[in-house]
Amino acid sequence: MKTVGYAIVGTGYFGAELGRIMKEQEGARIVAVLDPENGQTIAEELDCDVETDLDTLYSREDVEAVIVATPNYLHKEPVIKAAEHGVNVFCEKPIALSYQDCDEMVRTCQEHGVIFMAGHVMNFFHGVRYAKKLINDGVIGKVLYCHSARNGWEEQQPTISWKKIREKSGGHLYHHIHELDCVQFLMGGMPEEVTMTGGNVAHQGEAFGDEDDMLFVNMQFSDNRYAVLEWGSAFHWPEHYVLIQGTKGAIKIDMCDCGGTLKVDGREEHFLVHESQEEDDDRTRIYHGTEMDGAIMYGKPGKKPPMWLHSIMKNEMKYLNGILHGKEVDDEFRPLLTGEAARAAIATADACTKSRFEDRKVKLSEIIGEGSTI
């Protein structure tokens, strides 16, 4: 098996762990990192070089692919430059903070013939894949409605993270875009229209950032189907789940009291959300035992992700490495590698943002163009 050389741009909480995981994969080697704050420390740990310039990094003959895990607002340049140098790309979510930037990133990768994989990690949850199979098999009938919630309470922090600044993170809607992507995956595509309401109701003043701490999204899909999504850090009763209602039954993927449930004909079947009961129990323990509610908890450089998160990140990196070694793309993951999932998530998020600030229902065609498809 050939060895694929990977670079990492952004070696904070997520980037460093993705590097550790990729280093363990067969036929994979981390050859260089670029991060002005954390790069040297992680390079020593991963036994690789440190670079300080993107063009120099991507010009290296041993760099075949890059993992981009910079802060959200800094994704575009390293992705575009990688494509221009013929380097394959894995980019963490949210891919961009605007549909225009996301579309440019995807198109540039397509034009230069490089792989572009979106880091929508919920696609690698055992429970999400199982729920999709149940839907495809018609077990719960036609899906009529999805409801997701990802909320909790956040106290004042010692410093204001970039993740709390809307211009840099996009706020809960973009930074926690996993549930939006998951709902669209389960519903089979984007909604036709959206409405978003919300605001900053409990975290105002100089000690806090400027993101909205309560957001409520209503989505209307074709064929008379609907979804409601909630996010925020102003909820003292924390919840984190995706609920799917069909004409014959329902499925709940609960990430707070971690476990999945299928309900059909008055009977319940339980299934794992992650790869093992130990991982599900680990997530439940963390969600109920941290100072900040687990659904809205943020990682920091120097910390390592919990067991359940490490496991799905490992699945994600193993899949990426397999693709770069010639493995065929599975149909269920194809949108992650065609730009479809990346564009669809950001298009819907942009429509929601437009609705919030223009106080009206917004059609997705206003974002992607009339008659356009993702």
Curated annotation (Swiss-Prot):
Its cofactor is NAD(+). Induction: Induced in the presence of 2,7-anhydro-Neu5Ac or alpha2-3-sialyllactose (3'SL). It catalyses: N-acetyl-2,7-anhydro-alpha-neuraminate + H2O = N-acetyl-alpha-neuraminate. Changing residue 178 to A: Loss of activity. Keywords: Lyase, NAD. Neu5Ac is produced in the presence of NAD(+) or NADH, but not in the presence of FAD. One of its GO terms (molecular function) is nucleotide binding. NAD(+) binds at residues 13-14, 35, 38, 70, 72, 75, 92-93, 162-163. Coiled coil: none annotated. Pfam families: GFO_IDH_MocA, GFO_IDH_MocA_C. Gene3D superfamilies: Dihydrodipicolinate Reductase, domain 2, NAD(P)-binding Rossmann-like Domain. InterPro entries: Gfo/Idh/MocA-like_OxRdtase_C (IPR004104), Gfo/Idh/MocA-like_OxRdtase_N (IPR000683), Gfo/Idh/MocA_Oxidoreductases (IPR051450), NAD(P)-bd_dom_sf (IPR036291). Disruption phenotype: Deletion of the nan cluster abolishes the ability to grow on sialylated substrates. The fitness of the nan mutant is significantly impaired, with a reduced ability to colonize the mucus layer in monocolonized mice. Its EC number is 4.2.1.-. Hydratase involved in the degradation of sialic acids, which are present in the host mucus layer and represent a much-coveted source of nutrients for R.gnavus, a prevalent member of the normal gut microbiota. Catalyzes the reversible conversion of the dehydrated form of N-acetylneuraminate (Neu5Ac), 2,7-anhydro-N-acetylneuraminate (2,7-AN), to Neu5Ac, allowing growth on 2,7-AN produced by the IT-sialidase NanH. Acts through a multistep mechanism involving a keto intermediate and cycling of NADH/NAD(+). Belongs to the Gfo/Idh/MocA family. This is 2,7-anhydro-N-acetylneuraminate hydratase. It comes from Mediterraneibacter gnavus (strain ATCC 29149 / DSM 114966 / JCM 6515 / VPI C7-9) (Ruminococcus gnavus). The lineage of its organism: Bacteria, Bacillati, Bacillota, Clostridia, Lachnospirales.
